[in-house]
């Protein structure tokens, strides 16, 4: 990060045009490219100007207006999905493994291995994102993760021993891998494409606030559910995210539109026309027709 260049867009927004030009010439362009760096810089300057024109005069309350409410719901809902899919289990993985019956050292080793698995799956998600549609990407992950959470909870209802503890822990690791492959990256794809340009920063910001609030709630209730001195539910705690996921699957199916391959102009027109969620993927229209 010490040697990383500042974004030319950020420099332009700060009025540091000469520094932005230098960054474009030295850091963002290959010596073999036959492109005029000044032309690239001019395009960036124009982009920043258009961005300012679009976002000027907007307020946070605008994201809840009739015009933007549907899009705001999708953004906030996807942030909530990302947070709530693994409630309880994901907040304290090592502690969960220990409560499932693993020795402390093994529980720590499992969490370290889980970190490596998550990194590999996150890298593979780049490839998967190109192959799958946005809705499919999220829904496939949701279905698999819901199933895994139910399996963890059901196994915990059986008489506990070390073997079942390892089974629950392995399932939790698989859940984490699936999460990094699907719901985690799909959330960022969807919120970036669904939010309106004029209020994008505000919409995503409010959604992230909701995500953080849900994370705080999870961190408060998890110790109570897992701790032997409190509820002592152990793996049965997975019933909570499993049930949440079950209902969230329906929300994703009926409310999250397919935006892959659409321009922002097309998406604005489709939301303005009230295109049903499941018709987004195949919807065809005259982009320049009047919009009510």
Give short role names for the model-derived ranges.
Residues 27-38:
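Short intracellular "coupling" helices and adjacent cytoplasmic loop segments at the cytosolic face
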Residues 37-40, 112:
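Short, conserved alpha-helical segments within structured domains
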Residues 1-25, 49-292:
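Alpha-helical transmembrane bundle of multi-pass membrane proteins
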């Amino acid at each position: 990060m010490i040697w990383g260049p500042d974004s030319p867009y950020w420099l332009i927004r700060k009025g540091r045009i000469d520094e932005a030009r230098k960054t474009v010439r030295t850091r963002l362009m290959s010596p073999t490219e036959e492109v005029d760096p000044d032309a690239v810089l001019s395009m960036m300057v124009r982009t920043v100007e258009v961005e300012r024109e679009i976002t000027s005069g907007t307020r946070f309350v605008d994201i809840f207006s009739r015009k933007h409410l549907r899009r705001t719901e999708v953004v906030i809902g996807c942030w909530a999905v990302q947070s709530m899919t693994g409630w309880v289990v994901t907040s304290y993985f090592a502690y969960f493994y220990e409560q499932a019956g693993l020795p402390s050292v093994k529980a720590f080793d499992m969490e370290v291995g889980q970190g490596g698995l998550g990194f590999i799956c996150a890298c593979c998600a780049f490839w998967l994102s190109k192959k799958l549609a946005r809705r499919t990407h999220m829904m496939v992950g949701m279905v698999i993760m819901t199933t895994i959470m139910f399996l963890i909870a059901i196994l915990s209802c059986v008489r506990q021993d070390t073997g079942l503890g390892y089974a629950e822990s392995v399932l939790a690791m698989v859940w984490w891998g699936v999460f990094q492959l699907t719901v985690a990256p799909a959330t960022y794809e969807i919120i970036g494409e669904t939010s309106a340009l004029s209020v994008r920063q505000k919409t995503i910001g409010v959604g992230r606030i909701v995500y953080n609030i849900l994370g705080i709630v999870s961190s408060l209730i998890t110790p109570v559910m897992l701790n032997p001195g409190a509820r002592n539910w152990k793996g049965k705690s997975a019933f909570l995210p499993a049930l949440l996921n079950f209902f969230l699957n329906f929300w994703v199916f009926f409310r999250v539109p397919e935006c892959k391959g659409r321009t922002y102009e097309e998406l604005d027109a489709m939301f303005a026309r009230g295109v049903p969620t499941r018709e987004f993927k195949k919807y065809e229209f005259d982009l320049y027709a009047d919009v009510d």
